[in-house]
């Protein structure tokens, strides 16, 4: 996995709609809600603006702009139209490697770390060995949205992201994100905003070719 491959994507893959749980809802039921929300959202495009500040050499700070594409069940793509090419080439890979909650049970060994009635913390261990040792995911029990993700790598590095949501056409979608990446020889802070959503456009699979 590319060193800048996972963090921000964090969670547009978790584009989730709000719904109130019944009292005492179990973590399993919460995950079911997370996996089945936004039932009418089949695809979208949106405008992405991102700021990346590298805290290690070469200490670049870059503003990027592009179009974000999503198509069910798990296709994600960012095509940048402006920004520093070197940074953009890394950044557009972020969104291609995030799996939605509907696939968590298939791809990870899943356990519940804690549930205080407001927030549930999950641990996801990949069933297939790769660079990620495990993922810590935090979900809001009321809205069934992924609020934070942290990828913990075998090399001792990590990437983390916090999601902030808004409403679009009756769906809850990511409006902004903040995050951080620390890996050997590479440290960066990330912030992004996503707006201009167009819901359920006809998207060709060719857009996602090569991902």
What kind of region is each of these model predictions?
Residues 40, 70-72, 116, 143, ...:
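Short loop/turn positions at the edges of beta-strands in beta-sheet-rich folds
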Residues 15, 20-53:
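N-terminal leader/targeting segments and the immediate start of mature chains
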Residues 53-115:
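An acidic-aromatic
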Residues 27-30, 100-111, 156-160:
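A short, amphipathic edge element
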Residues 1-10:
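Bacterial N-terminal signal peptides that target proteins for export
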Residues 44-50, 64-68, 74-80, 133-135, ...:
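One face of beta-strands
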Residues 118-210:
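Gly/Pro-enriched, hydrophobic low-complexity segments
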């Amino acid at each position: 996995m590319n060193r800048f491959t996972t963090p921000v994507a964090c969670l547009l893959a978790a584009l989730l709609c709000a719904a109130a749980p019944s009292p005492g809802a179990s973590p399993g039921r919460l995950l079911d809600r997370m996996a089945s929300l936004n039932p009418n959202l089949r695809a979208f495009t949106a405008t992405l603006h991102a700021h990346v500040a590298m805290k290690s050499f070469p200490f670049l700070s870059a503003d990027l702009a592009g179009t974000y594409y999503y198509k069910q069940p798990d296709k994600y793509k960012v095509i940048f139209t402006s920004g520093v090419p070197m940074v953009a080439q890394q950044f557009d890979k972020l969104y291609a490697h995030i799996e939605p909650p509907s696939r968590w049970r298939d791809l990870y060994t899943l356990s519940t770390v804690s549930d205080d009635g407001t927030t549930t913390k999950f641990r996801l261990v990949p069933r297939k060995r790769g660079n990620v040792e495990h993922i810590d995911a935090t979900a809001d029990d009321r809205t069934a949205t992924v609020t934070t993700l942290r990828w913990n790598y075998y090399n001792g590095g990590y990437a983390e992201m916090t999601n902030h949501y808004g409403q679009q056409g009756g769906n809850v979608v990511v409006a902004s994100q903040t995050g951080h990446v620390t890996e050997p020889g590479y440290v960066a802070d990330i912030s992004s905003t996503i707006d201009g959503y167009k819901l359920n456009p006809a998207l060709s699979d060719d857009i996602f070719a090569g991902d």
